[in-house]
């Protein structure tokens, strides 16, 4: 059984994401996945967001558990990926999976016939 970790999303991020999703033309599987993630999220006001939880604009460090490789990225909206160094779009599988996680959480999901598993190592606000 694959139990997903709880996620917390700010109401500001929720509103920005729904605005993007409602107007996005692209990969419907990825859009559906992000809608599913938002459907299971707990929403809080931005000023009440815990510092160790991933939000849009967060700089985060995570590890791919299969390869052991660590990555440091900034979670962005799709149109921001060209202007932000080390950006990861919220519309990528990893970006959507990391939204709302807290430091120490792991998430595992099926992807192209196998499972991907990421562990969130650190978060800082940019």
PLM feature segments, named:
Residues 1-53:
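N-terminal intrinsically disordered, low-complexity, charge/repeat-rich segments that act as generic
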Residues 94-106:
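Beta-rich strand-turn-strand
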Residues 42, 82-93:
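Short, structured beta-strand/loop micro-motifs enriched in basic residues and often containing a Trp
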Residues 47, 93, 114:
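Histidine- and aromatic-rich ligand-binding microenvironments
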Residues 73-77, 87-89:
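Short, acidic/hydrophobic/Gly-rich beta-strand patch recurrent on exposed beta strands
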Residues 34, 58, 86:
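Short basic alpha-helical hairpin corresponding to helix-turn-helix/winged-helix-like nucleic-acid-binding
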Residues 2, 124-126:
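Short, charged, intrinsically disordered terminal tails
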Residues 54-66, 72-74, 103-124:
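FKBP-type peptidyl-prolyl cis-trans isomerase
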């Amino acid at each position: 059984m694959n139990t997903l970790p709880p996620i917390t999303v700010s109401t500001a991020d929720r509103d920005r994401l729904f605005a993007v999703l409602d107007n996005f033309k692209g990969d419907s599987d990825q859009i559906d996945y992000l809608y599913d993630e938002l459907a299971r999220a707990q929403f809080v006001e931005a000023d009440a967001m815990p510092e160790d939880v991933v939000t849009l604009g967060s700089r985060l460090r995570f590890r791919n558990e299969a390869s052991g490789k660590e990555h440091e990225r900034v979670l962005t909206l799709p149109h921001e990926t060209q202007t932000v160094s080390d950006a990861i779009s919220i519309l990528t599988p990893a970006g959507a999976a990391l939204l709302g996680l807290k430091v120490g959480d792991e998430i595992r999901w099926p992807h192209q016939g196998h499972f991907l598993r990421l562990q969130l190592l650190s978060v800082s606000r940019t």
